[in-house]
Amino acid sequence: EQLADYGDEEQPAGSTILKTLIALPIYRQLLVFSFLTTLLRSVFLFWTPKFLFDIGLGASSAILRSAIFPLLGVLGTVFIGWYTDHHAKNGDRARMMWMMLSVLVLCMVAISLLSASETPNFNLILFFLGASGFFLLGPYSMSSGCLTLDIAGAKGAGSCTGIIDGMGYIGGAIAAFAAGAMSDYLGWSQVFLVLSVFALISTASAWFMSRGFQKIAKA
């Protein structure tokens, strides 16, 4: 059953849907989550080839090896979808989301430390890049998919998804230029350290969503 209550209206107005959704703490946390995870996703997709090139890989090798991020990300989306369908207690999909994102934080700190070396270990960096894809894209895929229906239901799914994706695209637009500019001034090691903070905030937002789902289930 959906969390949003639109009253007895069969086709609630857009303003009714918006007010109802914004009044839900879980939905507000989901907006923060969407903004940050789309920002992180965009940094990886736009800038991973440049990052690998800057730390010493050849141009063609950097482009090819950067594919490990979305490739393992596919596995992450399949895993979290299967797991939450079969094992999420009381419909709390956010629990697995914050658990996966907490591992993402560790992966990004590891990339930051490894890329600061004068002789980077490329195999380890690629391992953590792939792991980042798995642990980021899985939770990311939940924001405008399953969680939309869990929160807004069929009546409000379109508006709910539009707002969530809109917030995400703002984060993606910022990432498209900010990460490259930061790397020029601070270096990639510092960029990934900053991104790990964003990942930590994403983890916290998913944790608060999980707490919200648990409280509703117990009510």
Language model: regions and residue ranges:
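Extracytoplasmic gate region of multi-pass secondary transporters
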Residues: L24-G81, Y140-G145, I174-A176
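A late C-terminal transmembrane helix in Major Facilitator Superfamily
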Residues: A154-Y185
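Juxtamembrane intracellular "pre-TM" segments in multi-pass secondary transporters
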Residues: E1-L30
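A membrane-interface helix-boundary motif in multi-pass transporters
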Residues: G180-A199
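Helix-to-loop junctions at the C-terminal end of transmembrane segments
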Residues: T77-G91, S183-D184
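Cytoplasmic membrane-interface "Motif A"-like loop-to-helix N-cap segments
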Residues: H86-S102
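Hydrophobic core of transmembrane alpha-helices in multi-pass small-molecule transporters
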Residues: N121-M142, C146
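C-terminal ends and interior cores of transmembrane alpha-helices
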Residues: S102-E118
